Amino acid sequence: MPPRYANKETELVARGVHVKKFSAIAERAERRLDQLVAATSLADLGLPGLRLEALKGDRQGQYSVRINRQYRICFEWVDGEAVNVEIVDYHN
C-alpha cells in the first residue's frame, strides 16, 4: 500500500512529477520514497546510507531517512507502513 503523504508536494515527487522546490533532489528523493514503500519493517530501512533516525522533541514518534545533508524524509511507522510522509528541509 502506498504511504499516506503529509503534503501534496511530497506525493508529487513520489509519483515522479516535477516540483520546482525539490528539483535539485527529486531523483534521489523519489528513490528514497520507493525504498520507504518497499519496506515491511523499520529494520528494512536500517541501511547505512539511509541513516534512519528516531526523532526527538516536537517530532517525537517520527523517524527520518536522509536524502542529503539538508533534506530528510520524515514519517511515522504505524502497523508496518509509513504514514504522514513528508520531505523536510532539515535546516529550517
Predicted features, each with a name:
Residues 1, 18, 41, 48-51, ...:
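Glycine-rich, flexible loop/turn motifs
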Residues 1, 32, 51, 61-63:
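A generic secondary-structure signal marking the coil-to-beta-strand transition
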Residues 1-32:
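Arg/Lys-rich, positively charged N-terminal/basic patches that mediate binding to nucleic acids
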Residues 6, 18, 27, 47-50, ...:
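Short capping/connector residues at structural and topological boundaries
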Residues 24-51:
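Compact soluble domain cores
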Residues 53-56, 63-92:
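Enriched for short, Lys/Arg-rich terminal
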